Amino acid sequence: MNSMKTEENKSFSAMEDDQRTRPEVSKDTVMKQTHADTPVDHCLSGIRKCSSTFKLKSEVNKHETALEMQNPNLNNKECCFTFTLNGNSRKLDRSVFTAYGKPSESIYSALSANDYFSERIKNQFNKNIIVYEEKTIDGHINLGMPLKCLPSDSHFKITFGQRKSSKEDGHILRQCENPNMECILFHVVAIGRTRKKIVKINELHEKGSKLCIYALKGETIEGALCKDGRFRSDIGEFEWKLKEGHKKIYGKQSMVDEVSGKVLEMDISKKKALQQKDIHKKIKQNESATDEINHQSLIQSKKKVHKPKKDGETKDVEHSREQILPPQDLSHYIKDKTRQTIPRIRNYYFCSLPRKYRQINSQVRRRPHLGRRYAINLDVQKEAINLLKNYQTLNEAIMHQYPNFKEEAQWVRKYFREEQKRMNLSPAKQFNIYKKDFGKMTANSVSVATCEQLTYYSKSVGFMQWDNNGNTGNATCFVFNGGYIFTCRHVVHLMVGKNTHPSLWPDIISKCAKVTFTYTEFCPTPDNWFSIEPWLKVSNENLDYAILKLKENGNAFPPGLWRQISPQPSTGLIYLIGHPEGQIKKIDGCTVIPLNERLKKYPNDCQDGLVDLYDTTSNVYCMFTQRSFLSEVWNTHTLSYDTCFSDGSSGSPVFNASGKLVALHTFGLFYQRGFNVHALIEFGYSMDSILCDIKKTNESLYKSLNDEKLETYDEEKGKQESSLQDHQIEPMEC
């Protein structure tokens, strides 16, 4: 093993004490890239001389191949270039500095390793780095260019320009995805023919200015310009071509191999190439072009390897070169396609607006402050990325299944416009409302402890059913303590019927009504039903509550909820447990409507029904106006919420997020639109208000409801029943 020490600069000799070892000759010979018109006897340092054409060739002559096989670490040798740095245009700094780096490193990487440059760049925040090579290339350089592409004796003039916006990721550079691949250099004039502005940076938009573009062999011209980063972001939306003088014309899909070393001028069409009908077609073309680039470049590279040389090469060298060529990385193509698609989609929605709205929009949009523009650009970028994630093209098969898709889409747009006028909403605010309502913005997850607690309390919730001589119905109730159950006063009215004297109510209820607490999956057996005693001492029509008493049937009463009383919450989540529409026992989680928002809520619901009256079929409560429900809106004894519980849920207990009993569900009005039932208003009266009214009306009953002896008696009776059931189960004899 021989050792080799790089001696590019004497000042670096002390830093490079570690000698580099030369590995043995193997078949994995590194494929070397040389510039055009390079003499055979050139010293094989990391820096290559470049002719005026700046074309990079992949052919390697016999002498260079032999040297590579003897020294495979040749490409690891350091390259260098000089530069001057002018941070302030008023103060000219003529100091010359030298930067070093490996051939595979980028220009920016070599500059960052220089202490002077790294120190000066700290003070140039939010500025573009403009690099001009003034000796050999005579053009503005991309900072991502590998050092192997630079001719020897390259000298850079580096200046800083103020960036207008911060959406570009720092310094504009293109990362070299595959340093082992051959690079192509060509020039593009910074000012276009038809459209003059083709670059992002104003400092580059000067007469006579040229941009030096580097690209990987096998790429298209369009891909190289889009990935360069210095051209305008919507360059992919236009039809353009590159001209060499007045003779040769190159299109977007032309290969960069054809323009190597040439100076080209861009001619952009005045009309944008992508209209609404061409968006999907263009996206598909870009996807296929990406695959073709990758496939074609690999084929060309393999053909280049297998092509025999006139001077002759061994099969081992050809085989090793074929193995050393890795497949191209498609990440930059994906980024390129994403960057091109975002402005297309934005342009599509802008073009879909009527002309008068576009004029208004253009008048309103003024150039904001720099900090404001930075925030706007970030928001636009995030929205575009989210739009791309959810963007999907519907194929013809799906469209045939939905022939009315366009009509439905127009109907939705019309509805949104009417809602914006009616509610005085901006499109952004309207979108955020729908996003909150339907986009899972509000977390509705429930802890397991709360679920277990609610499941235990559901044992106290009963299904009440009655049949008063053909007058049938059902409702919900719950056990408060002992055999006392709470339900709604209007439920009692439904049981006994109209124009029935109150003195007859207890007997009628006792004969026609029954309660079960086990209707959770299947219809309960007769043993699981409780009758009701002819007892009705306390009820209140204003608070809509009534207290009934269960008749003993040998079974223990369910546990009561009298220990779980809590004040009603002003906001947050609540849970209702009941039997909506006479169905099995269910739990509904919903949100509380704060007192100050009730006045906005109910008139809006009424307006919704009136505005969409032409689209409804029946049962729209058109008699409600903005003055409706004013007593309930400002009533502090009520708790308002949005629930899906409808008929049959009156008398359901309402629990807060901690599982405490806060209200008795009493009032709910619904209307039918089409085949769907919508809630108009839902109320429950707080348990604190109900208990205070009971204490004023019948203090002895209030004490009985809070008597611990009733609960103790029920617990002992429940234990006796469970022990009797255990004794009844006898073991089988063998």
From Swiss-Prot:
Disease: Poikiloderma, hereditary fibrosing, with tendon contractures, myopathy, and pulmonary fibrosis: An autosomal dominant form of hereditary poikiloderma, a genodermatosis characterized by mottled pigmentation, telangiectasia, and epidermal atrophy. POIKTMP features include tendon contracture, myopathy, and progressive pulmonary fibrosis.
Compositionally biased tracts (Basic and acidic residues): 1-10, 17-32, 310-321
InterPro entries documented for this protein: Peptidase_S1_PA, Peptidase_S1_PA_chymotrypsin
Top-level taxon: Eukaryota
Assigned EC number: 3.4.21.-
Annotated organism of origin: Homo sapiens
Cysteines joined through disulfide linkages: none
Region (Disordered): 1-32, 285-321, 712-734
Primary enzyme class: hydrolase
Name of the protein in question: Serine protease FAM111B
Tissue expression per record: Widely expressed.
Any GO BP annotation: proteolysis
Keyword Hydrolase: yes
N-acetylmethionine: residues carrying this PTM: 1
Family listed: Belongs to the FAM111 family.
Keywords: Acetylation, Disease variant, Hydrolase, Isopeptide bond, Protease, Ubl conjugation
Single GO term (MF): serine-type peptidase activity
Main function: Serine protease.
Chain positions of cross-link Glycyl lysine isopeptide (Lys-Gly) (interchain with G-Cter in SUMO2): 284
Active site: 490, 544, 650
Gene3D superfamilies, sorted: Trypsin-like serine proteases
Pfam families, alphabetized: Trypsin_2 (PF13365)
GO cellular component, one term: cytoplasm
